[in-house]
Every structure is written in C-alpha cells, then in structure tokens.
C-alpha cells in the first residue's frame, strides 16, 4: 500500500446527499487508484443535531454505492479528551488565550465594524489580558499570526490560494461550554489519522487558511488540499431539495442502480476525454484529481436517467431480478409464488426500462392476468375484427410447435399473410389481451415468457370480454 491516506468526514445531521456522495467517491477513487487508505470519520461534535438515524443513513448510502472504507467509522465525540489536551497545549505555549467577551459585546463590535465599512472580525480585546476575570464564562481563541504576512496553500484543483493574515481573526477553538469547534477538531483528527490529502467541497476553502495556521502552530505536517466545486441545480442555484431528490437512498428507492449513480457523480466535475460510460474498474484506473474542473457542475436528472437505462439494458438479468423483487412485493407480487422466472421476464423488459420502478410496473402483467383492458386502444378496431384475430391466434397457437420468440414472430407473419392483415392489426389486439395495454415487449417475447398455455387462456378471456361489449 502507498502512504496516501484520505478521508470522508460527513456530519450526521441528515442523509447522505449527492454532493457528499461525490466527495466520498473522489476520495475513494484516489485511495483505490494509489493503493492508499480510505477512512470514514463521523463528525458528530454538533451534539444537538447529530442523530444515530443520520449515521445509519450515511453508512447505508455508502454501502449501497459500494464505497467500502478501510478504517472507521471513527466518531469525533470519542476524541473530546484528546482535543482538550491540544487546546491546553496551545494555551500553555501562548498560542491560544481565553476570551471573556460576551455575545452582546461581540455583536456591538460587529455592528460598529459594519457601520464604519470594515470587515467584521474580532478585535483582540482579550488577546493580551494580564489578569483573568474570575467566575466569568470564556471561550478559547487561537492566537492567529498578526505579522502582516499571508497564509497560502496549494490546492490540487484551484492552484495556489493566499489569504492575507490581517483578514483572519482569532478563531474560537473551544466554546464556553467546553466543547471544541469544528475547525479545531478537524485539524487534530486529520493530523492524528495522518491524512495526506483532504478532498472536500469548496465551501471549505475559507476554513483552510485557519486550519493551516493551526497545523503549523501545533507542529503537524500540513496535508494537501483539493476543493471540489459545488453541484448546482438547473437554475444555477446550489443543489437542494427543491431541485428534486438529493438523497442517495432516495435514488435507490426510485429504482436507480448504484453503478449508474456512481458513473453520473464521477462525471460531475471530472472528465476523461469525451468518455461518458465508466465501469467501477475504469473509474479507478482513469481517475486523476488534477482532471477535476474548477467550475461548478449542473445536476441533470435526464442524464442520470439515461445512464440508468444504459446500465439496466446491459445488466445481468439475474442480478436485476434480485433487485426487482422488493419493488414487485411493494406492488403485491411475489415472483416466488408462481409465474415466469423473473430473470426470464426481465430479459424482455431491459430494453425499455429506465428505472427499476418502471421495470416493476412493466413486469406486473406477467404475474397478474389483466383484469381490465385499454378500451381506447381496443376501440380502434372493429368488434368483428378483434373476435376474428383472437379466434385465429388461439387456434394457430394451439397447433404451433414454435418455442422461440423468433418462431412465434414468424407465426404471426404467417397469420397476417394468410388473412391479409397488417402486423399492427394483429399485434396490438394480442398485446392488449396479454398485458392489458399497448406498452409491452414484443409478442414473441411475451408468449415465450408466459408460456403457450397461459397465452391462449388470456386471449380467450379477452375474446370473451369483447363479445360482451
């Protein structure tokens, strides 16, 4: 294994959304490409908002996508004693100090700065206190460099980024209740876990110079950084629930395949020539963080749907059958209780289905004979014609020796030639008889899947229905 160590560090305050999943994917790909280590860390320091339900949802989403981790999951709340040790170290070395300013005082300072046209920042009131007030609540602030210099870091995606030190105020590293803050915890965790490359969303860019200063103050090596551009909705606003589903598990429940979502996410910001389709192994082999663009990506549901249809069309029928069972059971169908083999039925549906939900709806007629028929479609044909078609087809099928879809299709061509009918004049009525509607696989495929006996019975029931009209 290489020395590359990366991490995905979600906050358990909600589900695993597509933006987080893409960040996890990029970290996972870099680790697998370099033979490195992928670590899962749960950043649960926000005790009030963090829930076990969210942790479970994140792990479930990761597992569904196949983003296996090598170490973890680790929880930040388990490290509180360690954080306190390092905060005390900063205090002992004069690199941090206690700040006794009240919330009201800080708000007044902020309002004054805004009024005077200055960027709001802490003014260092408590930075050089010689006496510590007794029995007053305090926060601990990091003593940021005030030498007029700058803090820079090289971003693997955005290039060199520099922040003037006079724009960075003294960061709070410990709240008044004694809990450490995010920016401090993440530095300690990444340092202790020996993270070499931090890949995360570019909403963290402004946190980075503060974190770099903390690494340096504590004597830790500074990792490499790669800030991934955000994902936008079709209106160019940041992707959110109002743009549709954003939860990874929601896409699973809507019938998307994990490989389709992975393929789509990897192309949101990363490219390899004009290639669109990538297997998991191809992603690992071709991924390079330097090929991630700097501009935001727009989430396109239609493109994801196209990819999903591709993977369904080319998927293994038996695997798809296993995935389809829960969707069928939600519709009251258990393929184990009778009907055609599900994998056989799926072969007739793969060409047209875009999601597993669509496939489940399309498969229902194989397991439940139609209880009603598309009257609008039937009305396009004269009653006498329908009765003639059903009688002729039932008779021909009873005597037929055909066993393959192609042979049954040939039989229908013979019927058309013999009767002077065009194929739609036979195919549509028969498709309605077998499935209840006009949107179904080819006639030959349906007959092979249902079996000749079931096919004839359904045609006879349709004939009886037409006779009563």
UniProtKB/Swiss-Prot annotation:
CDD domains: GluRS_core. Binds 1 zinc ion per subunit. A motif ('KMSKS' region) lies at residues 238-242. ATP binds at residue 241. Zn(2+) binds at residues 99, 101, 126, 128. It is found in: Cytoplasm. Keywords: Aminoacyl-tRNA synthetase, ATP-binding, Cytoplasm, Ligase, Metal-binding, Nucleotide-binding, Protein biosynthesis, Zinc. Its EC number is 6.1.1.17. A motif ('HIGH' region) lies at residues 10-20. Its cofactor is Zn(2+). The keyword Translocase does not apply. Pfam families: Anticodon_2, tRNA-synt_1c. It catalyses: tRNA(Glu) + L-glutamate + ATP = L-glutamyl-tRNA(Glu) + AMP + diphosphate. One of its GO terms (molecular function) is glutamate-tRNA ligase activity. GO terms for biological process: glutamyl-tRNA aminoacylation. One of its GO terms (cellular component) is cytosol. Catalyzes the attachment of glutamate to tRNA(Glu) in a two-step reaction: glutamate is first activated by ATP to form Glu-AMP and then transferred to the acceptor end of tRNA(Glu). Belongs to the class-I aminoacyl-tRNA synthetase family. Glutamate--tRNA ligase type 1 subfamily. Monomer. This is Glutamate--tRNA ligase. It comes from Pelobacter propionicus (strain DSM 2379 / NBRC 103807 / OttBd1). The gene is gltX.
């Amino acid at each position: 294994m290489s020395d590359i160590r990366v991490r995905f560090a979600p906050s358990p305050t909600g589900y695993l959304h597509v933006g987080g999943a893409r960040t996890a994917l990029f970290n996972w790909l870099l680790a697998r490409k370099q033979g490195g280590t992928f670590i899962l860390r749960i950043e649960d320091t926000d005790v009030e908002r963090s829930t076990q339900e969210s942790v479970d949802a994140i792990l479930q989403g990761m597992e569904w996508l196949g983003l296996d981790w090598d170490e973890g999951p680790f929880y930040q709340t388990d490290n509180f004693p360690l954080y306190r040790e390092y905060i005390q170290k900063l205090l002992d070395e004069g690199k941090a100090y206690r700040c006794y300013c009240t919330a009201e005082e800080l708000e007044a300072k902020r309002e004054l700065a805004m009024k005077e046209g200055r960027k709001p920042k802490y003014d260092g009131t408590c930075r050089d206190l010689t006496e510590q007030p007794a029995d007053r609540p305090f926060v601990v602030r990091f003593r940021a460099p005030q030498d007029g210099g700058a803090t820079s870091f090289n971003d693997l995606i955005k290039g060199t980024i520099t922040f003037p030190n006079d724009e960075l105020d003294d960061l709070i590293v410990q709240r008044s209740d004694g809990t450490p803050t995010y920016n401090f915890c993440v530095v300690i965790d990444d340092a202790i876990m020996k993270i070499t490359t931090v890949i995360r969303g570019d909403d963290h860019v402004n946190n980075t110079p503060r974190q770099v200063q903390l690494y340096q103050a504590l004597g830790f090596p500074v990792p490499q950084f790669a800030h991934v551009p955000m994902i936008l909705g079709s209106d160019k606003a940041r992707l959110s629930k109002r743009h549709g589903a954003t939860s990874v598990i929601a896409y699973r429940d809507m019938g998307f395949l994990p490989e389709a979502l992975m393929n789509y996410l990897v192309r949101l910001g990363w490219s390899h020539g004009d290639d669109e389709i990538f297997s998991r192994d191809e992603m690992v082999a071709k991924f390079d963080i330097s090929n991630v663009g700097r501009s935001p990506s727009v989430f396109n549901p239609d493109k994801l749907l196209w990819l999903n249809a591709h993977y369904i069309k080319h998927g293994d029928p038996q695997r798809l059958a296993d995935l389809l069972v829960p969707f069928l059971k939600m519709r009251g169908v258990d393929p184990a209780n009778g009907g055609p083999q599900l994998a056989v039925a799926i072969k007739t549906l793969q060409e047209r289905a875009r999601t597993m939900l669509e496939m489940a709806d399309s498969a229902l007629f194989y397991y439940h004979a139609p209880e009603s028929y598309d009257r609008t479609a039937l009305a396009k044909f004269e009653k006498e014609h329908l009765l003639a078609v059903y009688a002729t087809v039932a008779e021909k099928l009873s005597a037929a020796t055909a066993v393959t879809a192609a042979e049954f299709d040939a039989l229908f061509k013979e019927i058309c030639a013999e009767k002077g009918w065009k194929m739609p004049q036979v195919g549509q009525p028969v498709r309605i008889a077998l499935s209840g509607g006009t949107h179904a696989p080819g006639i030959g495929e349906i007959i092979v899947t249902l079996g000749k006996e079931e096919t004839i019975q359904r045609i006879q029931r349709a004939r009886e229905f037409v006779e009563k009209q």
